[in-house]
């Protein structure tokens, strides 16, 4: 009698986005079971001398191009934090809106995670420093070059999504008991 081989695990490609009006980090990873693989990452920079609408268009057009190039199955965006500078918070909100809209327009499901949730998923503590996050991203994704912190943060958002996705899948299969 032949034993049945375990079912093949699906590979899911995810785009992580760390939105900002000046610099938006992005990172693409693949998850197969609990294995993660780095695909690409980078930063979208806008010209601060341009108008806000022009900068948002650059952000939208570039994110759309990334969606066409990398064909992610899902996307994840870091939630906005509120700081003392109301104008800066509003501009960050504009960029975040574009980061949520671009994948949605291509029918790519979008998840949102707060900074503490991302740090907890990647480092194990919600109070992790940027250096700790970057170190763990490099450990979890060998080959990622992380030229800018924004790209590392975007990859961390994608890793967080992969972990949360795996947990939800285990609950749905009944593999985890309450």
Swiss-Prot record:
Its main location: cytoplasm. It catalyses: Endonucleolytic cleavage at a junction such as a reciprocal single-stranded crossover between two homologous DNA duplexes (Holliday junction). It is found in: Cytoplasm. It holds the Pfam family RuvC. Mg(2+) 2 binds at residue 78. The keyword Lyase does not apply. The keyword Transmembrane helix does not apply. Mg(2+) 1 binds at residues 18, 150. One of its GO terms (molecular function) is magnesium ion binding. It comes from the Bacteria. One of its GO terms (biological process) is DNA repair. One of its GO terms (cellular component) is cytoplasm. Disulfide bonds: none annotated. Keywords: Cytoplasm, DNA damage, DNA recombination, DNA repair, DNA-binding, Endonuclease, Hydrolase, Magnesium, Metal-binding, Nuclease. The active site is at residues 18, 78, 150. Its EC number is 3.1.21.10. Its cofactor is Mg(2+). Binds 2 Mg(2+) ion per subunit. Homodimer which binds Holliday junction (HJ) DNA. The HJ becomes 2-fold symmetrical on binding to RuvC with unstacked arms; it has a different conformation from HJ DNA in complex with RuvA. In the full resolvosome a probable DNA-RuvA(4)-RuvB(12)-RuvC(2) complex forms which resolves the HJ. Belongs to the RuvC family. HAMAP family: RuvC (MF_00034). The RuvA-RuvB-RuvC complex processes Holliday junction (HJ) DNA during genetic recombination and DNA repair. Endonuclease that resolves HJ intermediates. Cleaves cruciform DNA by making single-stranded nicks across the HJ at symmetrical positions within the homologous arms, yielding a 5'-phosphate and a 3'-hydroxyl group; requires a central core of homology in the junction. The consensus cleavage sequence is 5'-(A/T)TT(C/G)-3'. Cleavage occurs on the 3'-side of the TT dinucleotide at the point of strand exchange. This is Crossover junction endodeoxyribonuclease RuvC. The lineage of its organism: Bacteria, Pseudomonadati, Pseudomonadota, Alphaproteobacteria, Acetobacterales. The gene is ruvC.
């Amino acid at each position: 009698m032949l034993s049945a081989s375990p079912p093949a695990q699906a590979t899911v490609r995810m785009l992580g986005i760390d939105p900002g009006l000046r610099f938006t980090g992005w990172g693409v990873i693949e998850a197969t079971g609990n294995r993660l693989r780095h695909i690409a990452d980078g930063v979208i920079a806008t010209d601060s001398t341009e108008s806000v609408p022009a900068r948002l268009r650059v952000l939208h057009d570039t994110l759309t191009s990334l969606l066409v190039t990398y064909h992610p199955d899902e996307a994840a965006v870091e939630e906005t934090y509120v700081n003392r500078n109301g104008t800066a918070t509003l501009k960050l909100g504009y960029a975040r809106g574009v980061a949520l809209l671009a994948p949605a327009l291509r029918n790519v499901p979008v998840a949102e995670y707060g900074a503490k949730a991302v740090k907890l998923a990647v480092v194990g503590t919600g109070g992790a420093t940027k250096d700790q996050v970057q170190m763990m991203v490099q450990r979890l994704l060998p080959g990622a070059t992380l030229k800018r912190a924004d790209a590392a943060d975007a990859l961390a958002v994608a890793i967080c999504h992969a972990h949360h996705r795996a947990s939800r899948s285990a609950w749905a299969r009944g593999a985890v008991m309450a």
